[in-house]
UniProtKB/Swiss-Prot annotation:
UniProt membrane topology term: Peripheral membrane protein
Descriptive protein name: Clusterin
Signal sequence range: 1-21
Post-translational modification note: Proteolytically cleaved on its way through the secretory system, probably within the Golgi lumen. Proteolytic cleavage is not necessary for its chaperone activity. All non-secreted forms are not proteolytically cleaved. Chaperone activity of uncleaved forms is dependent on a non-reducing environment.
The family this protein is said to belong to: Belongs to the clusterin family.
Membrane is among the record's keywords: yes
GO cellular component, one term: extracellular space
Residues annotated with Phosphoserine modification: S132, S396
Motif Nuclear localization signal, chain ranges: 77-80, 443-447
Annotated glycan sites: N85, N102, N144, N291, N328, N354, N374
Gene encoding the protein: CLU
Keyword Amino-acid biosynthesis set for record: no
Alphabetical list of InterPro entries matching this protein: Clusterin (IPR016016), Clusterin-like (IPR000753), Clusterin_C (IPR016015), Clusterin_CS (IPR033986), Clusterin_N (IPR016014)
């Protein structure tokens, strides 16, 4: 008898599988909840698309800053190249008279080489560590083949400047190629009427609007972008996926184009020998391994090497000293402009990385809407549909003091959320809380996938 009474009691409290305490939730109430939740989701979609426009504006602003910086780079490049040309001209003129003082410099060079080798190998063993034996043999050959005149005119500094110029040109070319590829995609994307409407136009999409109004707001049928994605007559119904997936695909393509080429950049920009600390040491290690020229940077630590730099040949050839002074002046100027160019290049790279970061934000901001669009294949009018509402009184598995709500976002998997019972079902905040939690879980799962 007790069992029978219990069954009767359960039957009285059940209706279509939805329960809440002693009062069943009717189909009409579930529909009202679904409508309230759908309104919240609709608002979040609008906010997401507003966010897309805001990020688009930031990308355009960053691009304007990039263009301005590029102009400054071009001016600095002209000054740098002018100084480099003057340096090479002075070097050529000096080489024509290198026989002067050759005997004095050669004698000093023979005393300079052992000190230079010892100082360099100590540095390499302490800082660079790997492959000291091979580097020592390579350095021996380099010093034997080098001339004291090359040392006297600071040939290592000239070679470093020319190599930096080559690397800087390469870095800028890579960044420009990267941006041009991404920019062509973004230009096509941002020219669509979806992005060109005024900010106050907050009407983007609603499941309750007519297909005609929806298509006229989002697409300019004359644009190439619209023609590419609208292979069907304008009067046909546009589903959510048809409208948003192409945007997402193009944003993803732009981000890939940007990142692919930025990854080709060196870990650090070329003009690092003027910097201090670990970066400088790593650069010297690299130069020593490459062709031993990094060792010449240690000439200040060897007395005989310093004496070579102090040799005065003006007695035998007054014009040579003047040429050397001109070389040193143009060399210092070239180093100054090369350093300035490198600083501007780093700023330019930061702008590029900012654009890449904004594209990533654009991707993340838009991806959940786009992924959600893949689920909107049915004719259901609700974004969010409430299927079950229960509490501890009706389901012992529900923790005390909580209301459990099972919902579906479009055709997605069921999502279960809990709401404190202090927020009653009649409270306007109830379904807002449910929808917010459901959307958070959906976004989280979408990111993990």
């Amino acid at each position: 008898m007790k069992t029978l009474l219990l069954l009767v009691g359960l039957l009285l409290t059940l209706e279509n599988g939805q329960v809440l305490g002693d009062k069943a939730v009717s189909d009409r109430e579930l529909q009202e909840m679904s409508t309230q939740g759908s309104n919240y989701i609709n608002k979040e979609i609008k906010n997401a698309l507003k966010g897309v426009k805001q990020i688009k504006n930031l990308i355009e602003q960053t691009n304007e800053e990039r263009k301005s910086l590029l102009g400054t780079l071009e001016e600095a490049k002209k000054k740098k190249e002018g100084a480099l040309n003057d340096t090479k001209d002075s070097e050529m003129k000096l080489k024509e008279s290198q026989g002067v003082c050759n005997e004095t410099m050669t004698a000093l060079w023979e005393e300079c080489k052992p000190c230079l080798k010892q100082t360099c190998m100590k540095f390499y063993a302490r800082v660079c560590r790997s492959g000291s034996g091979l580097v020592g043999h390579q350095l021996e050959e380099f010093l034997n083949q080098s001339s004291p005149f090359y040392f006297w005119i600071n040939g290592d500094r000239i070679d470093s400047l020319l190599e930096n110029d080559r690397q800087q040109t390469h870095v800028l070319d890579v960044m420009q190629d990267s941006f041009d590829r991404a920019s062509s995609i973004m230009d096509e994307l941002f020219q669509d009427r979806f992005f060109t409407r005024e900010p106050q136009d907050t009407y983007y999409y609603s499941p309750f609007s007519s297909p005609h109004r929806r298509s006229s707001l989002l697409f300019n049928p004359k644009s190439r972008f619209a023609r590419n994605i609208m292979h069907f007559p304008m009067y046909r119904h546009l589903n959510f996926n048809d409208m948003f997936q192409p945007f997402f695909d193009m944003i993803h393509q732009a981000q890939q184009a940007m990142n692919l080429h930025l990854h080709r950049l060196p870990d650090q920009l070329p003009m690092t020998e003027f910097s201090e600390g670990d970066n400088h040491d790593r650069t010297v290690c690299k130069e020593i391994r490459h062709n031993s020229t990094g060792c010449l940077k240690m000439k200040d630590q060897c007395e005989k090497c310093q004496e070579i730099l102090s040799v005065d040949c003006s007695t035998n050839n007054p014009s040579q000293m003047q040429l050397r002074q001109e070389l040193n002046n143009s060399l210092q100027l070239a180093e100054k402009f090369t350093k300035l160019y490198d600083e501007l290049l780093q700023s330019y790279q930061e702008k590029m990385l900012n654009t890449s970061s904004l594209l990533k934000q654009l991707n993340e901001q838009f991806s959940w809407v786009s992924q959600l669009a893949n689920l909107t294949q049915g004719e259901d009018q609700y974004y969010l549909q409430v299927t079950t509402v229960s509490s501890h009184n009706s389901d012992s598995e529900v923790p005390s003091g909580l209301t459990r709500v099972v919902v579906k976002l479009f055709d997605s998997y069921p999502i279960t959320v809990t709401v404190p019972e202090v927020v009653s079902r009649n409270n306007p905040k109830f379904m807002e809380t449910v929808a917010e939690k459901a959307l958070q879980e959906y976004r989280q799962k979408n990111r993990e996938e």
